[in-house]
Amino acid sequence: MTTFFQQHFSRNKWLAYAQLMRFDKPIGTLLLLHPTLWALFAAAGGMPPLSVLVIFVLGVIVMRAAGCVINDYADRHIDGEVKRTSQRPLATGRVTTTEAKILFVLLLCIAFVLDLLLNRYTFLLSFVAVALAIIYPFMKRFTHLPQVVLGMAFGWAIPMAYGAVSESLPLECWLLFFANIFWTVAYDTQYAMVDRDDDLRIGVKSTAILFAQYDNKIIALLQFITLVLLVIFGWISQYHWGYFVVLGLSASLFSHQCWLTKQRVREQCFKAFLNNHYFGLGVFFAILVGIYA
């Protein structure tokens, strides 16, 4: 029994579990949290019920962790071939495939309990979220557009938030949802640009490979479409003009990102990806200004 606990629950093992769930790299959680907060506050016309807010924040943390576990499980045979991912717990053997599968199921169970605390409408929508989380990691084997599926997975919290607050999915919900998809494809292409050389070598597909030398131009187009959808969203929602001012200021970050990725240097592309956290935060502030100003 002692050996069992030492093998599966030692301090080093807990650290490996935490790394597998990316607790040491919160950027993914933030990029999932921002659109969730957009939708919660937009649907409520202000502060959503505290219980709903807490459930969704916890749900973001849990589902982001689950997504990382299933992603690394799917990529366990190729992560070791990529410079950026070669030290991940499954790639190095610090976490076994059995441990990863058990952890994934436990995280889904926690998410299931959280969903039970919401209304039936939202509970039913949550099954789509789980399906997208499971499907996404395997898409890079079959299509150059896995980022689109990631955008759907990261954005599905938006209809869930509207469902939890209003039990309806109005036009505003879908404008935010599709804005988030275009934004996600843009920033995850920046992320994929970091690994492009490795991905080409091992045969992994991505939008960074698909877009090739047109990558920066297409990213700029995707960002422009994101902004157009967010402007339409604000107009339909009849937000205060301050929303559009803050949104415009946030949009200036896209210009900075284009400058960073211009030379396609790995480190600069990764900085551009990280910078999207501030854009997501800016949109959230814009919504608050639009509602309360």
UniProtKB/Swiss-Prot annotation:
Location relative to the cell: Cell inner membrane
Catalytic activity from the UniProt record: all-trans-octaprenyl diphosphate + 4-hydroxybenzoate = 4-hydroxy-3-(all-trans-octaprenyl)benzoate + diphosphate
Family matches, as Gene3D superfamilies: UbiA prenyltransferase
Pathway assigned to this chain's UniProt record: Cofactor biosynthesis; ubiquinone biosynthesis
InterPro entries, alphabetized: HB_polyprenyltransferase-like, Prenyltransferase, UbiA_prenyltransferase, UbiA_prenylTrfase_CS, UbiA_sf
Cellular component terms (Gene Ontology): plasma membrane
Residue stretches spanning the membrane: 41-61, 98-118, 122-142, 145-165, 167-187, 218-238, 241-261, 272-292
Cofactor needs: Mg(2+)
Any one Gene Ontology molecular-function term assigned to this protein's record: 4-hydroxybenzoate polyprenyltransferase activity
Membrane topology annotation: Multi-pass membrane protein
Keywords: Cell inner membrane, Cell membrane, Magnesium, Membrane, Transferase, Transmembrane, Transmembrane helix, Ubiquinone biosynthesis
Source organism superkingdom: Bacteria
UniProt keyword Cell inner membrane present: yes
Subcellular location, principal: membrane
Gene Ontology biological process: ubiquinone biosynthetic process
Record-listed E.C. numbers: 2.5.1.39
UniProt feature coiled coil, ranges: none
Family under the similarity heading: Belongs to the UbiA prenyltransferase family.
Function in brief: Catalyzes the prenylation of para-hydroxybenzoate (PHB) with an all-trans polyprenyl group. Mediates the second step in the final reaction sequence of ubiquinone-8 (UQ-8) biosynthesis, which is the condensation of the polyisoprenoid side chain with PHB, generating the first membrane-bound Q intermediate 3-octaprenyl-4-hydroxybenzoate.
Protein name listed in UniProt: 4-hydroxybenzoate octaprenyltransferase
Organism annotation: Actinobacillus pleuropneumoniae serotype 5b (strain L20)
Gene name, Swiss-Prot/TrEMBL: ubiA
